[in-house]
Amino acid sequence: MIDVKLLRKNPEIFYDAIKKRNMDTEIIDKILEVDKEWRELVAKVNELKAKRNEFSKLVAKAKVEKDNEKASKLIEESKKIGEEIKKIEEQEKKLEEEMQNLALNIPNIPAEDVPFGKDESENIEIRRWGEPRKFDFEPKAHWDLGPELSMMDFERGAKLSGSRFTVLYSYLARLERALIQFMLDVHTKEHGYTEVWVPQLVKRDAMLWTGKLPKFEEDAYCIEKDDMFLIPTAEVPLVALHAQEILSEKDLPIKYTAYSACYRREAGSYGKDVRGMIRQHQFDKVELVWITTPERSFEDLERLTQDAERILQLLELPYRVVSLCSGDLGFVSAKTYDIEVWLPSYNSYKEISSCSNTTDFQTRRSNIRYRGSDNKLHYAHALNGSGLAVGRTLVAIVENYQNEDGSITVPKVLVPYMGVEKIEVK
């Protein structure tokens, strides 16, 4: 959530931020208008309360002077003031709720070094690692290779659950499981993360705290009877773990990693990536979350991104890192790096991880603070990233490690997890 006090003091920061995101600034006009009305009512209530206090003193004086008639009149006047205060406070509360709802729909302020641009076509490439493989045969897409191995089944996935669901069998099912274990092992043993097992159903509050609601409600799977949500990412429970808590600066940064299934309706993606496993309603992901201090959060974003990159390096999969421009930046993010893996079926790089610094946007919503060395309370900063999206990593391995005979070579680091060096029809 935005800092309303900062908006009131420096509205130009928010006008500029909204323009950079290519959004209409009308919402800023509206919240400032509501805030002005609210402050006027607050001032009016304070004025009336002061007046009522004066009447209380006059009542006490009249009683001392045994002027009961005067005291009765003053008490009546005081009651009228009290009733007026009550009416105004009800209006005040409504305006406060309206202001809160408006604030929940204002995105985070882009960091100063975020490149300006209208959409993903203006994202800036930062670096590349590895070279795309040059095949001496015509490579196949995973949506052909998997079924030919009888290990990837889109038809039965659709029969069970509809479009954008996949069934994996045998060694591809094992590969999915191996990747999860491998990623968690690297992040916990090499990168110092604490592994967490989180619920995959969360309350509405948890979605609100992390900025998934109200903005993205139509993209979420909701259990209406219980008002619970299937998580779109483990970022939601990992950040919300510390909601309404006061942490100690000496315990920061907190670094969590968690595997979970993720559930997304993909409401706005009709016609995109309709073939294969790239865009699914249910997919596995290993998530990385940091709770850190404002002073080091952008440095920590670099570290988190490198942790995600390390998985691709160990798997020897070529990738690139891009910095998202202001027009492509996510709602909660102040700065984001996308990591994109090379996929032969697309003859291009496709997103496999998104690493973001949300600054104090999520921590204000969830009221995550820490006591600093100055003994004052400060809002922490929250970072998140995929480390990695498991299904897309599996797809990248299937396509980049394929052989002419239709078999798939298992990356060296995964052989101990898989128990085989090659996936093939037997």
Swiss-Prot record:
Q: Name one GO biological process term.
A: seryl-tRNA aminoacylation
Q: Which GO terms describe its cellular component?
A: cytoplasm
User: Which residues are ATP-binding?
Assistant: 264-266, 351-354
Which InterPro entries does this UniProt record tie to the protein? aa-tRNA-synt_IIb, aa-tRNA-synth_II, aa-tRNA-synth_II/BPL/LPL, Ser-tRNA-ligase_type_1, Ser-tRNA-synth_1_N, SerRS_1_N_sf, SerRS_core, tRNA-bd_arm
Q: Which reaction does it catalyse?
A: tRNA(Ser) + L-serine + ATP = L-seryl-tRNA(Ser) + AMP + diphosphate + H(+); tRNA(Sec) + L-serine + ATP = L-seryl-tRNA(Sec) + AMP + diphosphate + H(+)
Q: Where in the cell is it found?
A: Cytoplasm
The UniProt entry lists the main location of this chain as cytoplasm
Gene Ontology MF terms in the entry: ATP binding; serine-tRNA ligase activity
Keywords, sorted A to Z: Aminoacyl-tRNA synthetase, ATP-binding, Cytoplasm, Ligase, Nucleotide-binding, Protein biosynthesis
E.C. code: 6.1.1.11
**Kind of enzyme, top EC level?**
ligase
| Pathway assigned to this chain's UniProt record | Aminoacyl-tRNA biosynthesis; selenocysteinyl-tRNA(Sec) biosynthesis; L-seryl-tRNA(Sec) from L-serine and tRNA(Sec): step 1/1
Q: Does the keyword Ligase apply?
A: yes
- Residue positions annotated to bind L-serine are 233-235, 287, 386
Looking up Pfam families in the UniProt record yields: Seryl_tRNA_N, tRNA-synt_2b
Record's Gene3D superfamilies?
Bira Bifunctional Protein, Domain 2, Serine-tRNA synthetase, tRNA binding domain
| Family assignment from sequence similarity | Belongs to the class-II aminoacyl-tRNA synthetase family. Type-1 seryl-tRNA synthetase subfamily.
PANTHER family reported for this sequence: SERINE--TRNA LIGASE, SERYL-TRNA SYNTHETASE
Question: What does the domain comment read?
Answer: Consists of two distinct domains, a catalytic core and a N-terminal extension that is involved in tRNA binding.
Subunit structure, briefly?
Homodimer. The tRNA molecule binds across the dimer.
Q: What does this protein do?
A: Catalyzes the attachment of serine to tRNA(Ser). Is also able to aminoacylate tRNA(Sec) with serine, to form the misacylated tRNA L-seryl-tRNA(Sec), which will be further converted into selenocysteinyl-tRNA(Sec).
The name of this protein is Serine--tRNA ligase
